[in-house]
Design a protein with these regions (language model features):
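Hydrophobic, small-residue-rich transmembrane alpha-helices and their short perimembrane loops
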Residues: 1-102, 116, 121-122, 156
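Single-residue recognition of alpha-helix boundary sites
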Residues: 33-34, 67, 74-75, 107, ...
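Structural signal for membrane-spanning alpha-helices in multi-pass inner-membrane proteins
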Residues: 103, 107, 130-135, 160
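Membrane interface segments of multi-pass transport proteins and intramembrane proteases
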Residues: 108-114
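Alpha-helical membrane segments in multi-pass integral membrane proteins
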Residues: 119-126, 149
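Interfacial loop-to-transmembrane junctions
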Residues: 129-155
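Juxtamembrane boundary at the C-terminal end of a transmembrane helix
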Residues: 161-171
Length: 171
């Protein structure tokens, strides 16, 4: 029984860690890329990114907890097993905050045009590494999973850049 509980804890942890980290990286770098390319001042880019991270981390953490809780209620009614809702929410929140700051860091130290390149490059590298880590934890193909996660993140960045270019407020 203890082994089953450990597997459930591990499953909740992996699911929420990967989801929070991937969603935070993709959302944050997509948003920052879009507003940076639109000519937004660097201080606004940083402020927007930080607000996004904490609002989304809380939202995702709560959504994870509520989702896990609903699943737990269903499983109890159908005698499927136990889940740990609060753990999932906490892991989601923490991974979202930690990984969300990765795309912001370049904007703290360099001007916006260079920061945009660094932010996108670093985020894509981290997405690839996260895909590989996720594949390793789940026992699937490392390279394939890394590439898929990188391509999906790249698509979000492209959307942010396209919208930011279209709405360009800087001139």
């Amino acid at each position: 029984m203890a082994e089953v509980q450990k597997q459930k804890l591990t499953s909740v942890f992996i699911r929420n860690f990967v989801f929070g980290a991937e969603d935070s990286l993709v959302s944050t770098v997509g948003l920052l890329s879009g507003i940076a390319i639109a000519g937004t001042p660097r201080s606004y880019i940083v402020l927007t990114g930080i607000v996004l991270i904490f609002v989304e981390a809380f939202s995702m953490g709560v959504a994870s907890e509520l989702s896990e809780h609903s699943t737990e209620e269903y499983e109890q009614r159908h005698e499927v097993g136990e889940r740990i809702p609060m753990l999932g929410g906490l892991v989601m929140f923490v991974s979202y905050v930690v990984f969300g700051f990765i795309p912001i860091i370049p904007y703290l130290f360099t001007e916006s045009a260079a920061a945009l390149r660094y932010s996108v490059s670093i985020s894509l590298i981290v997405l690839f590494a996260l895909g590989v880590l996720s594949a390793r934890l789940s026992g699937t193909k490392l390279l394939r999973h890394g590439i898929v996660m990188t391509v999906m993140g790249g698509a979000a960045i492209a959307i942010g850049v396209a919208i930011g270019s279209f709405i360009n407020i800087g001139g």
